[in-house]
Amino acid sequence: MPRPQRSERVRELLRARHFRADLFGARLLADPAWDILLLAYVAALEHGRLLMADLCRAGLVPATTTVRWAKTLEKEGWLTRSSGPIEDPQSWLELSPMGRRNMERYLTFIESSRPA
């Protein structure tokens, strides 16, 4: 799937997650690690990396939770940081090669599972 279409598909997933949170409550169904990976993947498709401040603003959870999960994802090898401490709103994050590869595999699976 071309990048613009895939980017829009991931944005649809994010909008659906936000709508679900509105209906059922963000605390009940929070999944900050997955939200971070989806946002980082959109950034990878559109411009390469993601500013920590933007990541914190986009989340459905408090900024401290976003930072904690971003640290975990970095430690586990899903994200890389290109400047400053991760707590710094001006830090840049991006998917690691492993993160990008697995997000590609996941979206390919989702797309191939959709009815035509």
Put a short name on every predicted segment.
Residues 1-6:
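General nucleic-acid-binding
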Residues 10-38:
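Short alpha-helical segments that sit at the start of domains
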Residues 20, 104-116:
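Amphipathic alpha-helical dimerization/coiled-coil segments
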Residues 39-43:
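Short amphipathic alpha-helical elements of helix-turn-helix/winged-helix folds
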Residues 46-58:
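Short acidic, hydrophobic short linear motifs in intrinsically disordered regions
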Residues 60-75:
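Short amphipathic alpha-helical interaction segments
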Residues 74-85:
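A short, conserved structural fragment
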Residues 84-107:
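Short, cationic-aromatic polyanion-contact patches
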